[in-house]
C-alpha cells in the first residue's frame, strides 16, 4: 500500500515476464477493477493513477 508501481512491473507481476502484448492492457484491467471495487470509479479512492508512472494502491 502506498507504493507506486510502473505499468511494466504490474504487467510482469500479473501476466509474467514473457508477455509480449501492449502495456495498455494494464490500464484496461485497472479500469475493470475500479468498476468492481470503487464506489465511484470515476473518482477512485483505492487504485490511484500516478500520472506518467503507473498506479498506487491506497489502503
Task: List the model feature ranges, each with a label.
Residues 1-53:
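Positively charged, aromatic-enriched patches within helix-turn-helix-type DNA-binding elements
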Residues 57-59:
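Conserved hydrophobic "DFG−1" position in protein kinase catalytic cores
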Amino acid at each position: 500500500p502506498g507504493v507506486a508501481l510502473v505499468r511494466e512491473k504490474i504487467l510482469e507481476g500479473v501476466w509474467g515476464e514473457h508477455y509480449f502484448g501492449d502495456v495498455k492492457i494494464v490500464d484496461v484491467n485497472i479500469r475493470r477493477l475500479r468498476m468492481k471495487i470503487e464506489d465511484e470509479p470515476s473518482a477512485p479512492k483505492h487504485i490511484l493513477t500516478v500520472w506518467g508512472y503507473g498506479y498506487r494502491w491506497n489502503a
